[in-house]
Amino acid sequence: MAQFRSPSWNRLPFVVRLMVTATIALLVAGAAMLFFSARQDAEDARSDLAGQLQAERETLPAAVAEVVVIGDFSTLQQILDRYVGRQSMASIRFQDASGVTLESVDAPITPVAPAWFASWMDLADVSGTAAVVVGGHLYGEVALTLTAQGAVNRVWRRLLNHLAILALAIGIDFLGIWLVLRQGLAPLSRLQDGARALAEGDMAKRIAPEGSPEMRRLITAFNDMAEATQRSQDRLVRARDDAEIASKAKSKFLSSMSHELRTPLNSILGFAQVLDFDRRQPLNADQKVSVDHIMRAGQQLLELIEQVLDLARIESGRMTISIEDVVVDSAARECIQLTQPHADDQDITVLNEIDPRMAVRADWKCLRQVLLNLVSNGIKYNRKGGRLTLRSSPSGPGWGRISVIDTGEGIPEDLRDGLFEPFNRLGKEGSDVMGTGIGLTVSRELTEAMGGRIGYASAVGEGSTFWIELPLA
Amino acid sequence: MLHRIFKALAVVVGIASLGPWHAAAAGDALSFGVLSQRSAVLTAQYWNPVLEYVKAKTGTALALKVARTAPESNESIKAGGYDFVYSNTIFQPAMADAGYRVILRPRTEAIASHIVTLEDSPITSLKDLDGKVVGFPSLAAFVGYAVPMDHLMREGISVTPVFGGNQEGIMGQLKVGKVIAAAVNSQVMRAFAAREGVRYRILWGSEPFNNLPISVHPSVPGDVAEAVRTAIADMATDPEGMRILEETGKLVGQKPPYGFLPSSPDDYANYVEFYRTTLVKDIK
């Protein structure tokens, strides 16, 4: 049964497996039948020969007695000649008491069976004698030999006939299976077409039930499945449409609200700066602290609004992406330059290990925005006096990786699932680190919009590495 | 199937001289010829035990010799081919030169020739046979052919004879209706009818003739002939001999008394007279 579990066997077409199985079954059954039939034939032939010999021994003396008593040797010779014409009679000899001998020998029967078969049958010629006694007087003795060759030939021919019948049965079996399965499995191809149509989106595709009861049940089940899938997909489409409408409404709302918020916020920041830098009426210390609070809170709010606006543009599909060859080093240097003051505030060393020759297929603004977010996060969540490294490396054929490596405290395992969720700051909401919580969300959206990938690796107490991968130019 | 016969050998030792074949087969045995009246096997079943008995009693081995037909028997008798012979054809003039001499006759009553038909036959008298086909055992059958044919000729009844080869043969033909009437040995017919369940009607019967005698050839020494005659004649008084006679007698349907009596040619004088005066010229 090992072959029936092997992959190569299971890969064979169903029809072939069925035919092979049926053929093996027929061959085994046929071989057993032939074996036992031939063995029985051999046994019967052996018994027949013995029976015939006994019968001849019983009847032959009476048959020749008349001419033996008369001493009519010519007639006796004719009788012996006729006897060797009988089935299986090889030779017959009569010898009287004085030594007169008459003999008749049949022509040897030409063997038609191969030697191994004759040997396997184990049939030997049989011989016997019979006394010709009439009225108590012994006239002589008849010796006769029956050949087994005829029986061997008959059994061999019968075996060949059985083999021919077996071959015919296998042929009919093949033809029958092929015809039945060809007709019976025809609906499968239509079922296959239907499944392909479903896969290609034709949810209205249905198959007319046909064929055997089993096939009809299968087709009915397929149609039921298609029906359920169509209903399910309809629900999903409606849900998606509803979600898209809601998302667009939300984006529109956020965009509108952000615009509406940014205008007064800019006024607030502007007037705060005026107050801070008014040389005619300088602020006292308390006022200075209060104005600094207003400006810091305003900057944070403005940053938040900018990020929200970016996210809204991406989700609404209004973000325009222009893919071109971008030298990563230039984008990295600009980001470092923009964030250097913050790094200096934290006493963080920023290292640029970007290959100056590395160029990727990206939107320059988007790439700069992503790198800016990652570098900004790397500075904000680094330890004081730590280090931030920008590094480039190949990433598979045709791809390049840009990594931002910090030496912060790392991201705990239990918080990583919410890393790219918008407004999720992983428990830093109450800290003195300012942030909006949507930087990584925007970075992921932008990276994927450029056809790239984003990921990270982090070790608690050692730091984190955020990377993006983009096609090389 | 003869085409299948590859080889047929006849290795014959002395086959060219079949005359003394019995003697060759039995060494110094004397031949004992029997007129072919029954099948050879039945004849052998009857006579071989008797001959074995004689050998046991006298030390003289007798080898049975049976010819295919009665004419062949007669040819051998005519040539003096048998040392002893059981036949009544020795009385034919043509056989006289052989010189056989009667030494024993059956204890049974004398035989007669009968012309018979089946009991339900439309033939009721000999005259009804005029112009008909009548069966006979063979030209060599004395009471089966010579005597009845002589009578039919003397009565002016013309019949067309057909021959059955021997007594059994013609009786068999009568039984199955192949012949409407047959001339037979009265005793043989009686035994056959008893054995085969045949009911028959006798149309004519001849004068009695002593049944077939056992005769001896002049070449056989007198003491040997006498010893054989005594042994056979004494069988009826010897329990072992009687047992053999009874058993063999039953085989051929004989009725008692069994065995033979010493005899002489005088007991068969009517045979000689018949052959001298008969109108039948084709007796074998």
Task: Name each model-derived stretch.
Chain B
Residues 8-20:
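Bacterial N-terminal signal peptides
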Residues 28-37, 43, 127-144:
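Short loop->beta-strand "edge-of-pocket" segments that line small-molecule binding or catalytic clefts
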Residues 71-85, 97-98, 127, 168-183, ...:
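Short helices/loops that flank or line small-molecule/ion binding pockets
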Residues 27-34, 38-49, 216-284:
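An extracytoplasmic/periplasmic, membrane-proximal ligand-sensing/linker region
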Residues 102-125, 213-217:
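Hydrophobic/proline-rich hinge and linker segments of small-molecule sensing/allosteric domains
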Residues 26-90:
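Extracytoplasmic small-molecule ligand-binding "clamshell" domains
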